[in-house]
Amino acid sequence: MAKASVELTRELQDSIRRCLSQGAVLQQHRVKLETKPKKFEDRVLALTSWRLHLFPLKVPAKVESSFNVLEIRAFNTLSQNQILVETERGVVSMRLPSAESVDQVTRHVSSALSKVCPGPGCLIRRGNADTPEGPRDTSPNSETSTSTTHSVCGGFSETYAALCDYNGLHCREEVQWDVDTIYHAEDNREFNLLDFSHLESRDLALMVAALAYNQWFTKLYCKDLRLGSEVLEQVLHTLSKSGSLEELVLDNAGLKTDFVQKLAGVFGENGSCVLHALTLSHNPIEDKGFLSLSQQLLCFPAGLTKLCLAKTAVSPRGLQALGQTFGANPAFASSLRYLDLSKNPGLLATDEANALYSFLAQPNALVHLDLSGTDCAVDLLLGALLHGCCSHLTYLNLARNSCSHRKGREAPPAFKQFFSSAYTLSHVNLSATRLPLEALRALLQGLSLNSHLSDLHLDLSSCELRSAGAQALQEQLGAVTCIGSLDLSDNGFDSDLLTLVPALGKNKSLKHLFLGKNFNVKAKTLEEILHKLVQLIQEEDCSLQSLSVADSRLKLRTSILINALGSNTCLAKVDLSGNGMEDIGAKMLSKALQINSSLRTILWDRNNTSALGFLDIARALESNHTLRFMSFPVSDISQAYRSAPERTEDVWQKIQWCLVRNNHSQTCPQEQAFRLQQGLVTSSAEQMLQRLCGRVQEEVRALRLCPLEPVQDELLYARDLIKDAKNSRALFPSLCELGHVLANDGPVRQRLESVASEVSKAVDKELQVILESMVSLTQELCPVAMRVAEGHNKMLSNVAERVTVPRNFIRGALLEQAGQDIQNKLDEVKLSVVTYLTNSIVDEILQELYHSHKSLARHLTQLRTLSDPPGGAGPGQDPSSRGRGRSHDHEETDDELGTNIDTMAIKKQKRCRKIRPVSAFISGSPQDMESQLGSLGIPPGWFSGLGSSQPTASGSWEGLSELPTHGYKLRHQTQGRPRPPRTTPPGPGRPSVPVPGPRQENGMATRLDEGLEDFFSRRVMDESSSYPRTLRTMRPGPSEPPLPALQKRRRRGLFHFRRPRSFKGDRGPGSPTAGLLLPPPPPPPPTQESPPSPDPPSLGNNSSPCWSPEEESSLLPGFGGARGSSFCRKMGTERLEAGDGAPAPGTAQPPRVHGVALPGLGRTKGWSFDGKREGTDPDQEDSTQAWQKRRSSDDAGPGAWKPPPPPQSSKPSFSAMRRAEATWHIAEESAPNHSCQSPSPASQDGEEEKDGALFPERMVPARNAKEPPIGPRPPKPVAVPRGRRAPQVPGGREEAESSSAAPGANKPWLRLGSQQDQEEPEGQVPSDLGRRTAPLKPKRTRRAQSCDKLEPDRRRPPDPAGVCAGTSEPGTD
């Protein structure tokens, strides 16, 4: 600050400073102010940054007048110490005390003006030419400097402050700080009014006005912000003054027609205007503004490079003027690169569009063309583009237009010609454009002929392609190699996706696929489509990198696709938004993320996900280190936050923390990838290898004594193959370990270490050179300061010690960051190599083992033929049976392993192992999933085999049929419908078709709408479950009376499988009647509407129960389900002769057959065979018994019986369930049918059954061994089926009849399976031959007592009312 005049007192100076507290007082001078001509008065001149103040010589000081430097029109120095200032309000003349004071005032005003209006040269000249000018300081920090090259953002802050002072407004320091700090740090030359939208309109106007004098900013941007009239006036002022503003963006700023007219006038006034990009979209400028702007654009010598006039309410008349301007000004043909006229309906619908078409047909430089929503005729436009835009056009948006304004089915030739001739297209948008089939074919044919394009994004969404379009895509898309991204959303493909999805997979150039809003199909078809999609992304050569099924409303079936993401290695981005998959979908997604290592981006929202679903995702991301981005699910998060705000906030913060962690380079868990790949590679073919090795070993042992040399050579080769097969088990881990050992000190790491050392040396050398150069330059600029230093060398060494780069940092950056990324990629490649080698070797071993097995089996057959006597059949052997046996042996060789070891089947099974099975909460039954997954190569029983805890027979060869070698047979879709009962038994030549019974995966209740969509296409329940079951050997006698007409109609009814409400009771383990089934109640009257009680077949057979063909097909593999007709023929006589004794040793128990609860008919409580609701005790509601109740209530369907599970020693917790579900056995031969009433509580309660129902034998659970024995009770009559002979004991009928008259006929009937027990009489026949009684309760066996000891809580006093007269001991577990 200059020194104040000597005449000014200290008190006056302080008073002036206090008066101008808002601005710092830079100078104070005592002057003579000319108030009248030749009359001067004393005043004080105070100078601030942007204003000159005049004060009288009074205390306290008060401003008499002031003016801003921007008000100065002329500043003249009339004499050595007199100045004349001409302002907007008048002329001010004053004398200063000395020439030095005049010079100080002049330099201050000149510096202020140069900051506001930067420019070269001196702004103030002295009026007297004889007086030489003093020396001017042009240093950057001097007050008289006019250089603005070193000012921040072109001095915007100073200009803005001066304008605020000029207009008398407060200067916003936040504006100055933002510009000087943020804009300067980003080197941003775009002034965005949205950054200051929170300020008032007058403040925005001053910022825009400051741009008129600023040379730093080149772009003014404002979008979606309505600007006031003050701001718009300053925009026009800025455009009229600025010589540096190149781009103006006023998108949706509330502009009117008059503004555009004024803007056109401004362009004409400013000859130095350099504007080349103009955006006025979403403003109603209408035709008047369009015409004015078009006329002014004719005068642009350089034209425009970008013009955006989208949604401006322009008519074809305005477009015609604009097109004529483009054609009249030749500069536009070479300068215009970006043209957007979209969202103007009807703009190109008339003949006025020919002016624009003419411009487009000429050679031009257009790169981006957007004409969406303009009613453009696509065929005419493509004809114009074919001549003028093929060489440069990269973006073409023709959405929401019509293909042609003419009616006709012929494809326009422009489609094929343009798309085959374009050189640089990268984005084509034809969405919501109704393309005829011929146009679509022409488009695809043109792209298939184009060899210049690659990675083209083609948007065909909402084009209503439907079936015809899907067919065209299937035919033409395979030959198109330039499409990298294809959007087929919302095209109504629906069921056509079954064939379209595999066709899309054949295009290996396709990287991004969008299929949303195309799944409006039934549940069964939807699942098939999703499985096709799963098959597509699971292909080894799949090229897809991103997949979108957004807004498809897949709901819970989204999990079918999610389950395939776990082991998927091709997809990096997936969009699952808008599918309503709920929390169960989030849980399935979390399981996939735990093992996936390829996904980088997941988009999911609008899925009804709660905080629990997000919690599952957060837990999954803890073990996922590769997912980088997850879109913020606004809809689901807001909904979850309303219900659980704290949990939702914590979970989302955890998700974000995991994503931030994953975005940093780090080590990927290779051990997890190794274990996952090992399970998928080795376990797929390991079982086949083991079985083949076992069979070949048996054949080698059988042929080891054969003296023939060729046979011995094959045996030696077979032994070598077996050895290789055993070694192949360790092939995968050994190769992985070898790669890991070699990688520790491999050439890559050695090279990285050497590079780190070289980089460290290079960094040191570079720093040395830089420091020496900097010190030398500093010495030249500031030699005195450098001389003060102790010496050049010492300063250099001190600086070098401070700016050195540590070697550990360089080594860590190369080895731990970049090197780790390289190592992760190297590990992925090594794992793929190991997988390929292992698969190749295992496939070769399987083929060779199979060929060896076939050859050795052929030798065995020849030896058996030679060893047979030439006389034919031996004694007691039927020649036909022996021939059948030989043919069966030969069939075993081919049928058990299939016609060949199909490696494709193994690959399909491996692919299926990569897909997680569908959750039981989602799927109705595993059988439905198996039938729908046939095209994927999933063997029958695969899902049930994965979810079953039952062990399979490892020594059985029936499991080899799990690898299918040919397609599935066609099956009638309606054969599962309920049918009326057949009166004629099927002939021996008509085989029974096995029908798998419906089961559920985890016993949970199905949804209410489950099964409604595919009701008429799948079997709801077994036919035999609707009626009382009979043994296979039982046939109703001819004397059986026919059923009533009402009952026949009910049985033939479609909904005969429905149960009455009384079946919904729950039979818990502690129920009073859980272990005792009462005798049948009396027959009902004709008006009773209860269906016949479904009774289970006998379980007392010691060899195998007499299953019906439907029941045999429903068994699990290894438990009789795959034995076939030969096993039934072999076991037929044994079943009839074995009786009801205990099971023979080594005989497998039948497994539990799980049933599926029908919609609305699932049992929430227990039900009994006699149809009576059974209650439960309050003390049964513990966790274990509740789980058993769910299993027992959901595993059995209506009318389904429950065979016992595996032996008690393996699953002791199920003993109570088995005893509760045991049934009675009928032991005696039935006499003529007599309806008997039983004095049971069931009959007293009014429970009734229909006459003529057939009741097989029933079983009663064993009581506790510690209870006192119950004395013999008189036998009670039971209903027995007619036409059935009782099983014969070894003693014959005479022995049985003789024992019937002996005393002690009420002796319990034992079922121990021994010869002694078999010789005992089975029951006492009473004197009344018209009645037959059931046997008494048997003695307790050790195994039954051991079963009781496992559950002591079942012990309770017996119920004498529920004990029948005679019982039969069921087969022990």
UniProtKB/Swiss-Prot annotation:
<feature type="compositionally biased region" description="Low complexity">
    <location>
        <begin position="138"/>
        <end position="151"/>
    </location>
</feature>
<dbReference type="GO" id="GO:0034315">
    <property type="term" value="P:regulation of Arp2/3 complex-mediated actin nucleation"/>
</dbReference>
<feature type="repeat" description="LRR 6">
    <location>
        <begin position="453"/>
        <end position="475"/>
    </location>
</feature>
<feature type="repeat" description="LRR 8">
    <location>
        <begin position="510"/>
        <end position="536"/>
    </location>
</feature>
<dbReference type="InterPro" id="IPR041245">
    <property type="entry name" value="CARMIL_PH"/>
</dbReference>
<feature type="compositionally biased region" description="Pro residues">
    <location>
        <begin position="1269"/>
        <end position="1278"/>
    </location>
</feature>
<feature type="repeat" description="LRR 1">
    <location>
        <begin position="242"/>
        <end position="269"/>
    </location>
</feature>
<dbReference type="InterPro" id="IPR011993">
    <property type="entry name" value="PH-like_dom_sf"/>
</dbReference>
<protein>
    <recommendedName>
        <fullName>Capping protein, Arp2/3 and myosin-I linker protein 3</fullName>
    </recommendedName>
</protein>
<feature type="compositionally biased region" description="Pro residues">
    <location>
        <begin position="981"/>
        <end position="997"/>
    </location>
</feature>
<feature type="repeat" description="LRR 3">
    <location>
        <begin position="333"/>
        <end position="358"/>
    </location>
</feature>
<feature type="repeat" description="LRR 9">
    <location>
        <begin position="541"/>
        <end position="564"/>
    </location>
</feature>
<dbReference type="InterPro" id="IPR051279">
    <property type="entry name" value="PP1-Reg/Actin-Interact_Protein"/>
</dbReference>
<keyword id="KW-0472">Membrane</keyword>
<feature type="compositionally biased region" description="Basic and acidic residues">
    <location>
        <begin position="1218"/>
        <end position="1228"/>
    </location>
</feature>
<feature type="repeat" description="LRR 2">
    <location>
        <begin position="272"/>
        <end position="299"/>
    </location>
</feature>
<feature type="compositionally biased region" description="Pro residues">
    <location>
        <begin position="1078"/>
        <end position="1097"/>
    </location>
</feature>
<dbReference type="GO" id="GO:0098978">
    <property type="term" value="C:glutamatergic synapse"/>
</dbReference>
<dbReference type="Pfam" id="PF13516">
    <property type="entry name" value="LRR_6"/>
</dbReference>
<dbReference type="Pfam" id="PF16000">
    <property type="entry name" value="CARMIL_C"/>
</dbReference>
<feature type="compositionally biased region" description="Polar residues">
    <location>
        <begin position="1232"/>
        <end position="1243"/>
    </location>
</feature>
<keyword id="KW-0963">Cytoplasm</keyword>
<dbReference type="InterPro" id="IPR031943">
    <property type="entry name" value="CARMIL_C"/>
</dbReference>
<feature type="compositionally biased region" description="Basic and acidic residues">
    <location>
        <begin position="1007"/>
        <end position="1022"/>
    </location>
</feature>
<feature type="compositionally biased region" description="Low complexity">
    <location>
        <begin position="1098"/>
        <end position="1108"/>
    </location>
</feature>
<feature type="region of interest" description="Disordered">
    <location>
        <begin position="864"/>
        <end position="902"/>
    </location>
</feature>
<feature type="compositionally biased region" description="Basic and acidic residues">
    <location>
        <begin position="1345"/>
        <end position="1358"/>
    </location>
</feature>
<keyword id="KW-0677">Repeat</keyword>
<dbReference type="Pfam" id="PF17888">
    <property type="entry name" value="Carm_PH"/>
</dbReference>
<dbReference type="InterPro" id="IPR032675">
    <property type="entry name" value="LRR_dom_sf"/>
</dbReference>
<dbReference type="InterPro" id="IPR001611">
    <property type="entry name" value="Leu-rich_rpt"/>
</dbReference>
<feature type="repeat" description="LRR 4">
    <location>
        <begin position="390"/>
        <end position="417"/>
    </location>
</feature>
<feature type="repeat" description="LRR 7">
    <location>
        <begin position="480"/>
        <end position="507"/>
    </location>
</feature>
<dbReference type="GO" id="GO:0030027">
    <property type="term" value="C:lamellipodium"/>
</dbReference>
<feature type="compositionally biased region" description="Basic residues">
    <location>
        <begin position="1047"/>
        <end position="1062"/>
    </location>
</feature>
<feature type="region of interest" description="Disordered">
    <location>
        <begin position="970"/>
        <end position="1373"/>
    </location>
</feature>
<comment type="similarity">
    <text>Belongs to the CARMIL family.</text>
</comment>
<dbReference type="GO" id="GO:0016477">
    <property type="term" value="P:cell migration"/>
</dbReference>
<feature type="repeat" description="LRR 5">
    <location>
        <begin position="422"/>
        <end position="446"/>
    </location>
</feature>
<keyword id="KW-0433">Leucine-rich repeat</keyword>
<dbReference type="GO" id="GO:0098794">
    <property type="term" value="C:postsynapse"/>
</dbReference>
<dbReference type="GO" id="GO:0005737">
    <property type="term" value="C:cytoplasm"/>
</dbReference>
